[in-house]
Amino acid sequence: TFLFNRGYLDYHSDRFQDASLLIRRHGKGRLYALLPAHRKGGTICSHGGLTYGGLLTGSEAKAAYVCKLFEELNAYWRAQGIHKVVYKAMPWIYHRQPAQEDLYALTQICHASLTVREISSTILIDSKLKVGDSAKNGLRKARKRNLRCRMVDYRPEKQCDDPDWKAFWKILTDNLVMVHHTHPVHTLEEMMLLVGRFPEAIRLAVVYEPETQQPDGTCSDDVILGGTVLYLTGQVVHTQYIAASPEGKSCGALDMLFHWLLNDCFPERQQRCVKEDPILYFDFGKSTEDAGHYLNSSLIFQKEGFGGRGVCYDTYEWEL
């Protein structure tokens, strides 16, 4: 996943004291595992600046050695003056192969406690469930309005002046300020920096009302009604941000957008032009607040209406 790439982690290096680790086996020079992490006082967190962290291993990782590895990590952290570890485990949909040896080690070696459980909604692309009535009704409204969708190409000469990005970011910010009295985790400038570093992995998809000819003969610009920022991380397409304007919400803009994404952009693999395309899952992201204690029922209803079902994002803690 590109989230563990230095080009992504370092965009907010001023906010986190890096404590990431490269792990090699004794007597072997090959890299065995990675652990993105930062330190805050006497606490290690993997990772506070990411949706998830956790141990990243290859096919050589086996249960007994991963248990031994956590024993050595704990000893190393104690020697560094660390007294607490916060571990945001990688959800299983991001694994290229089964790799939950770390979770076993957390309970058996670290005696960790599950402190946060949040729920996301994910679609298995090759086995989609039926779309709900609400999404179907929204799609009919959008088609009646003749709405269109497009994937925004990265234009380095535009950067923060890209009209599609600016329009979407205003919609997103307005929604967050109005509903949650907060702002996006990223600024538009930060997001465009990341898009420039990972143009194939971070994409913006928008739904819009096409330009129309006015009575005086002039043409109005396309009106952006909603969109989503997509993170393409190996086999998972993850929606990092989703937003629609009040007008977009009233005319089914997001219903149109996700219908287009799931059926035209990321169809079942047997329908794809590039057969080796690895994408397996479409993840709508979490629908919880307050460390998982509050479930946003209207938000998860919309995601489940497209056939999304639960994948948990878990956080563990233990004392040293």
Question: How should each PLM-predicted stretch be described?
Answer:
Residues 16-18, 79-82, 270, 277-279:
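Short, high-confidence coil segments that cap the C-terminus of an alpha-helix
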Residues 22-24, 34-35, 68-72, 201-320:
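Aromatic (often tryptophan-rich) hydrophobic motifs at membrane interfaces
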Residues 48-96:
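A gly/proline- and charged-residue-enriched helix-loop-helix capping module
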Residues 48-50, 116, 311:
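Short, solvent-exposed loop/turn segments at the edges of secondary structure
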Residues 87, 168, 303:
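A residue-level signal for conserved active-site and pocket-lining positions in enzyme catalytic cores
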Residues 1-28, 32-43, 90-248:
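A conserved beta-strand-loop-helix scaffold within acyl/acetyltransferase catalytic domains
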